[in-house]
Amino acid sequence: MTNIRKTHPLMKIVNSSFIDLPAPSNISSWWNFGSLLGICLIMQILTGLFLAMHYTSDTMTAFSSVTHICRDVNYGWLIRYLHANGASMFFICLFLHVGRGLYYGSYMYLETWNIGVLLLFAVMATAFMGYVLPWGQMSFWGATVITNLLSAIPYIGTNLVEWIWGGFSVDKATLTRFFAFHFILPFIVAALAGVHLLFLHETGSNNPSGLNSDTDKIPFHPYYTIKDILGALIMISMLSSLVLFSPDMXGDPDNXXXXNPLNTPPHIKPEWYFLFAXAILRSIPNKLGGVLALVLSILILMIIPLLHTAKQRSMMFRPMSQCMFWILVADLLTLTWIGGQPVEYPFVVIGXLASVIYFLIILFIMPITSMIENQLLKW
């Protein structure tokens, strides 16, 4: 008799995705981040659900409701800090996952890649709106500054901003709708992640060599289930250390004081995972130009498959491209650092240079490097 996991309508979906799935025998730990992102998402939804049970989305009570969660709710402090720092872990895993895709040419799976970019946008939107909810100083002013960017859109800009605000400033209506969107978006992310996996399983996983691995496949279970559990344990231990030893490390001290529309903080900056985007945004002195650069800095990922000029898929055997890739990583770290610095000399100059280098490497230097390597293959 055939095993029930292969016949039952629901269980056979699980079976073909997580148990009998044929996987390449040589995928490294860089392939762990998909499952880690899934764990992050589940954890964020669960902790978020318990936070929503005690949170009030009203300007008068939002800040004190978060205080109440931390002081009076059983293990509320733990849930709150798991949720806040869980977002940081989420983005660490996201950036490493995208970096892996860039390095090993996983972007050649077009549907999987494009849905991945869409997922990145959705998670960024969710994180931004979640940051506003505690209604601290930086929450309020972050929301004001970022929503205000939409006013740069010609003709409809101002109306659009007031429509999003639900008034003439960030206020009660804005907070309520942000809470509603922040609650619904993670479920949309979960659905998109399902489609992401669906398209991935049409082609099967890529592998470090970038070569076809159909001749050498192993079952996902037990090999990669145990590997994923190890990865999860490492991530959970890192998150636990962060939450239990320095929960406020990644937060902004301004958020320890409640929002005050009459008092602007000297340096408005987002959470660390948006600093690179903030640096690109303010590297252009024009408002609309900055907004376009900001959107394009992520949207550029969509055209990366078109810029692939190399004869090999992966960078494993392409030392020159590897060099450019790590320069790009260093450039993004530079942008992240600049995003957290005040707007003054020399940071403005460094930021603008790093922004130009970012787009130059992706649009021109990488494709040209690949073409040079193609010529070197003939030698």
Swiss-Prot record:
The keyword Hydrolase does not apply. It is a multi-pass membrane protein. The chain crosses the membrane at residues 33-53, 77-98, 113-133, 178-198, 226-246, 288-308, 320-340, 347-367. One of its GO terms (cellular component) is respiratory chain complex III. The keyword Heme applies. Keywords: Electron transport, Heme, Iron, Membrane, Metal-binding, Mitochondrion, Mitochondrion inner membrane, Respiratory chain, Transmembrane, Transmembrane helix, Transport, Ubiquinone. Its cofactor is heme b. It is found in: Mitochondrion inner membrane. GO terms for biological process: mitochondrial electron transport, ubiquinol to cytochrome c. Heme b b562 binds at residues 83, 182. Its main location: mitochondrion. A ubiquinone binds at residue 201. Coiled coil: none annotated. Heme b b566 binds at residues 97, 196. Binds 2 heme b groups non-covalently. GO terms for molecular function: metal ion binding; ubiquinol-cytochrome-c reductase activity. The cytochrome bc1 complex contains 11 subunits: 3 respiratory subunits (MT-CYB, CYC1 and UQCRFS1), 2 core proteins (UQCRC1 and UQCRC2) and 6 low-molecular weight proteins (UQCRH/QCR6, UQCRB/QCR7, UQCRQ/QCR8, UQCR10/QCR9, UQCR11/QCR10 and a cleavage product of UQCRFS1). This cytochrome bc1 complex then forms a dimer. Component of the ubiquinol-cytochrome c reductase complex (complex III or cytochrome b-c1 complex) that is part of the mitochondrial respiratory chain. The b-c1 complex mediates electron transfer from ubiquinol to cytochrome c. Contributes to the generation of a proton gradient across the mitochondrial membrane that is then used for ATP synthesis. Heme 1 (or BL or b562) is low-potential and absorbs at about 562 nm, and heme 2 (or BH or b566) is high-potential and absorbs at about 566 nm. Belongs to the cytochrome b family. This is Cytochrome b. It comes from Crocidura suaveolens gueldenstaedtii. The lineage of its organism: Eukaryota, Metazoa, Chordata, Craniata, Vertebrata.
